[in-house]
Amino acid sequence: MRSIAVLSLVLGVVSASPLKRWAYSMYFDLQGHRGGRGETIENTLPSFAWGLINGVTTLEMDLGLTKDGHLIVWHDENIDPTKCKDTGAVEEGDPMYPYVGKYIANLTLSQVKTLDCGSLRLDGFPLQEVYAGTKLSTLSEMFDFVSCATDEEVLFNIETKVDGDYHNLTRSAEDFVKAIGEVYGQYNIWDRVTHQSFEWLALVLSKELYPQLRTSALFDDSTIYKQLPNGSGGNLTTHGTGPSNWLAGLDIDTFPGDTIAERVVRAAASINADLISPSVTAGASSAVDPAEEGWIGLVNKTMVDTAHSLGLQVKPWTANRKNLFEYLFDIGVDGIITDYPHELRRLLEHKGTYPLAPVGDVGRIMGCLAKHNQYTETKGNGKGY
């Protein structure tokens, strides 16, 4: 508790930007996954607005790279019909239309900007607020919105969506790394961004070109192993052998350690990653909650302790249950990526043992959302319902 009091006192005396940036490194890293997709339509300015209102430390998001070289905030390799709707072609007779179902790498920014990605509530997230007509944003547009919405030095955990198994479905790691460097340099935001990727080659290239940029090695038990002969990634109990397509040519079984947890951490350390971001639950698990029989955690205390001994932090994804939150606290993780940042924030406040980032100014944030959020011509009322 004393550390929280000291941190609050210091921030109350001085609010200069460098100090705020230091403070954000001291907060428990509460990350809103895709902004907080359990609460608001994912990877959109509305989701990031509510992430700020809920007091996240870090806005987590994903990037696609369009055919004409624009970074779009979006998770999927293609335009998912459960999340977006077509509103019309850019020009009459466009052979790529309809755009829904097409891959981001094959679409231009103009084509992507016709999509309504704010009207559809996902079945798996029935409490999502929708903002009808919302367009996808570029990385630059997202930074501009956040700059308007808060003076806090909120952090960004940004994934480059590179497909390690099927390289023709996305732009290359080289293309992504070049593109993010141009935008991060333009905004001089290096010390607030973590570059995360399942495709570790992107992280290797990132460290070579931008050594000041933090990198996070994403993985689950389908990406740390070589594909099975049937093309699937497998899991902890059934998988291929040899170098994984996702780990920049590394074979985790060649690294020292009695357990998979130790070996994968050492593999991440070998590419100079600053942190690891494993799936909370293993693909081999037959249950979704630690309280249930058959639950298998991919992240465990051995993994956390090994990472910390090598100077790496551990921030797992995607924890959406209170029992998972408690499990992760118990094994000593440094942050949690969740679809429900409001619920995690409530639990952290109740525990009272972790310093937390400030909650956002609702009026200011919503004013900036009204200014920056772009809508298709078929937009609804824009109020979130």
Predicted regions located by residue number:
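Phosphate-group recognition and catalysis centered on beta-loop-alpha active-site segments
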Residues: 2-5, 12-385
